[in-house]
C-alpha cells in the first residue's frame, strides 16, 4: 500500500521555537497523504487539494474547475443529493471548497469523533462520484454558479477584473479568463464534458490529502487505507508550465461602470511566479513603496495629493505567472492621471532615498510573526502543508521559505526594481463612472467588452428537487452504502478556565491562559459607541476611535507610533461600532509590556494631529459615499430606515452621516475622549501564554495613569418602530440580480429568549444546511445563497432574511421567502430541535 514514508520536524521563527511534526507517505494509486497530530483541541481537519484550477481549462470551456468544485457537493454513489451540507452540520463541523487559478481544495473541520465519517465522504466523491452526474443536476449547478457570477458583477467594479485580464494577458494565456468563467461557456457544458474533466484531473495521483488535529496516527492510516487505497489510479497530469507575461508596449484601457461613483485604477507590471528567487525581494520592494505612513506612495497620493484614503502595491505570484500590482479607488471625481503620476513620483523618491533598512527589518519581523499566526488553527496548518506539497513536493515549504525572505538584501531589492519596474511596460485599467471618460488615464482606449444582459438571462434547470436517474454502482471492497458510526472518542464540552480581576482603577479584565503559540491577543471594549452620539454629532465616537490609531500621541507622530508597533511586529486597531468602541491587538508574549506602554499612550495621550484628523474624516466620508453604491448596502439602509427612522443611529451606523461628519471638529473629539474614555465603563479580554500577575505588571502604567471618572450613559431611544407588512421596491437600473431583505424588530441579546431564537433560526437560515439555502439555491437555483439571522446586539436588534437572486427570479424568490418563513412554525419539529441542539453543542 505504502510506497515510502518520511517524518520531518520543522522549525521556524526565532521569536519562539515553533515546530510542526508531520508524516508524509504515498498510496500505490499515487495519493499523497500528510498526517499532522495536534492534541491542543479535540477537533480534526481533513483537506484534499487537487492540482487543477482555471489555468487547466481551455478557451470556450472556461469556469470548469470552479464548476466542478460545485458539482462535488451534489452527491456521490453513497451520499444522497446535498447530504454533504446536512451531515457536516449534524456533526457540529464546518466545510467548504475553493478554486484558484492553480488548484481546487475541499476541507472539513469536525469534532475528532467524525474523522472516519469525513474520510468516507471525501473518498466517495473522489472515487465514486462520476456515475451519479445527471443532466438535471448539471443544469441546477449551472444556475447556481451563474448566479454566483452575477452576484459579483452586480455592483461597482464588478467587471473590472474581466477587463484587466483581457488587456493584460495574451489571448489563450491560462490566467486570461476569470476563475468562475463565462456564463455562456457554463451553459454549454455537457455531462460528457464533466466526465472528461473528472477522469483527467480527479485522479488520486493529482491530489494530496492532509489530516491535521486530534487523532491517532495508526488508526488514521488504517482509515485512509480502507477508504482511499482501492480508488483507481490514473496518470498524473502534467502541470501547466510557467508562462510569464511580456508586454511589447504599455497598454492603457478604460471601462465605464454604471454603478461606480468614484474612479478606480489598476496598474500591473509583469514579474515572476511563486517561489522564483526574485519573488522574495519583489515582496519587500512593493511594501517599501506603498506600505506604511512613511512609504513614498502613501505620502504622495494620500497625504500630499489627497487623492485616495489608502493605496497599496503587491507582488502577486502564482504558479504560472506573477505581477507587481496595485488597485486604488480614489475619491469621487479624481482625474486618474494624477494618481497614475503618483506612482512614478513614488518610484523616483524611492530611487533617491534607497532602501530604508529599518523599514526592511520591520517588514521581515512582521512576516516572521505572521507565520506564527498561520500556525494558529489545524485548518490553516493543514492548508500550508497542502500548498507546499502540491507545488513543490515539500509540505514544509512555507516554513523553509522563511529563510528566503529573511535573506533578502537592499541590493536584491534595488536589482529587482531595475529589472521589473523602472521604465518597464505595464497595463493600466481605469474604471470610471459612466459618462466621465475625462477621468480616465490619458491615452486610454475604450475596453471592448460584452456582458450578459437581463434579457439574455435564462434558467437551465426545472424548479423543484433534481430527479436522480438510476446509475451503475462502482465495485468496492467494502460496503460503502453504510455510513460509518462516529468514533468512540467523542469530546466532552471543555470550557477553558477564565480568570478575572478588577484593577484598582475599575477596569475589569478577563483572560485565558493559552500556550499553543507565542502570541497574545488583547481587546479593550469601551461601553460607549455611536448609540450614545448626539444626533447632531453622529459619528463622533467612530472618528475618535480612528484618531487614536491614526493621530499619533503627545510624544510620537502618527508615523512614529505606526513604526513603534511595527518594530515589535504588533498589529493594533481601534474602531467604533454602534454600541461600543474597541481597541484590539496582538503581539508576541515577550513584547506585551512594551506594546501595552504604547497602547497606554494611545488611550491616555492622543496626539490629535490635525493632518491625520482631516485624512481620517475624509476616509469616513468616502466610506459613507461608497456604502450608497451597492445593492446590498442600499437595501440594508432602506430596511433600517423603515425599522428605526431616517436619522436614527441604527439606520446610519457608526460612521454617522455626511452632514454630521463634515461638521465634526478636533475639539468635538477631544471633548468626547475626555468625557467617555474611562476605565469604569471599559473591559479588557486577553488570551495568551501570560499569567494574570504578568499582565497586571505589564499594565502598571495604564493602571496608574488611567483615572476613573463618572460617565453619563444616556442615549437614544432604542425601540424599533412598529412595521407595516409592505413590500418596498428600489430601482437599481441594469442589475443582473435583485437583493431581497425582509424582517422586523428582534430581541436584545439580554432577552431571556435570545438564545432560543438563535436555536430556532438555525434550521431556518443560519447556514448552507438550512431551509432557505436548501430551497432557494439547491432546489431552485435562483441564488448563490440565502440566509436569515437575529442580530446579536444589546440594543440594535432585528430579525432579517436575505438573498441576492437572479433578476428574472425576483418575484418567485419573494414568494418563497414569505412561504418558508410564514410556514416555518408549522413544519418545525421536536426532532429538528434536538438535532440543532446536538450540532450546536458539538460545534462549540
Please place each PLM-identified region on the residue numbering.
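Sec-dependent signal peptide recognition
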Residues: 1-5
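Proteolytic maturation boundary segments
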Residues: 8-32, 216-257, 264, 299, ...
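M16 family metallopeptidases and their MPP-like homologs
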Residues: 36, 41-57, 63-67, 82-128, ...
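Metal-associated gating/positioning segment near the N- to mid-region
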Residues: 71-79, 86
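Non-catalytic, conformational "gating/processing" segments within enzyme and secreted inhibitor domains
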Residues: 135, 142, 195-227, 425, ...
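Short, conserved secondary-structure transition motifs
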Residues: 145-152, 243-256, 363-374, 587-588, ...
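Alpha-helical scaffold elements lining the catalytic groove of polysaccharide deacetylases
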Residues: 185-190, 194, 660-664, 669
